């Protein structure tokens, strides 16, 4: 039997219960040295179906107000018998990562290109110069970073994405400062030319959790190690630029 990891947390309230669901695997807790792994028992690495992904996100989101939560992307699996030893082996890295996100949430600000519906010869002033290029998007991202008032951020270009998605900036924001953060970036949103600035969140700090390949995942003596969905493919890497 294996365990599919949702998150590792500190200070999990005794009254916490996973969100109810009519179907899907049960949720189990494994406590080791002050850390709690939130998992589900599985017989194999789960397929990334829409219901499975939605259930994963719902469970992780239910941990948003825990003191410190280290969320994992879908598909991280360890052998259940090895889970306590795996946590113990990686406790220093896990605690360091939890310390970096303690009391914080992720706010993701999406930058969307705006396209006017005018005829070719009647372009409006806002889009007369064409849609913003990569430098223009990054300039808006830089203004957001300057105004955000937070120390940690990650900028990501959405090159090749469908639709008008162009870029995004993830910010690690203290939970109590979300409203102030939104107020600080509002002037940037109102002045952006040809770009819609769309804040989303708060979310669990996925963008600030270390990717699987950044944790020391080589199995220690006697441990079964870790694998991920997709034939061992690593979890998504952090965004291109980091504050």
What are these regions, as identified by a protein language model?
Residues 1-243:
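An interfacial alpha-helical scaffold signature
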């Amino acid at each position: 039997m294996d365990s599919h990891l949702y998150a590792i947390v500190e200070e999990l309230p005794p009254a916490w219960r996973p969100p109810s669901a009519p179907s899907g695997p049960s949720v189990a807790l494994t406590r080791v040295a002050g850390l709690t792994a939130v998992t589900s028992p599985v017989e194999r690495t789960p397929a990334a179906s829409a219901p499975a992904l939605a259930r994963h996100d719902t469970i992780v989101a239910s941990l948003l107000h825990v003191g410190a939560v280290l969320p994992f992307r879908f598909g991280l699996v360890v052998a259940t018998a090895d889970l306590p030893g795996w946590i113990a082996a990686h406790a220093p890295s896990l605690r360091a990562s939890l310390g970096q996100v303690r009391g914080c949430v992720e706010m993701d600000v999406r930058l969307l290109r705006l396209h006017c519906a005018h005829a070719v010869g009647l372009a409006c002033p806002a889009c007369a110069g064409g849609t913003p290029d990569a430098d223009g998007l990054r300039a808006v991202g830089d203004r957001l970073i300057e105004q955000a008032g937070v120390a940690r951020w990650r900028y990501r270009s959405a090159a090749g994405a469908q639709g008008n998605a162009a870029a995004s900036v993830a910010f690690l924001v203290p939970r109590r400062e979300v409203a102030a953060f939104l107020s600080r970036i509002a002037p940037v949103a109102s002045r952006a030319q040809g770009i819609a600035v769309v804040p989303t969140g708060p979310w669990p700090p996925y963008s600030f959790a270390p990717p699987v390949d950044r944790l020391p995942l080589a199995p220690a003596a006697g441990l079964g190690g870790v694998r991920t969905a997709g034939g061992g493919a690593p979890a998504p890497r952090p965004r291109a630029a980091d504050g």
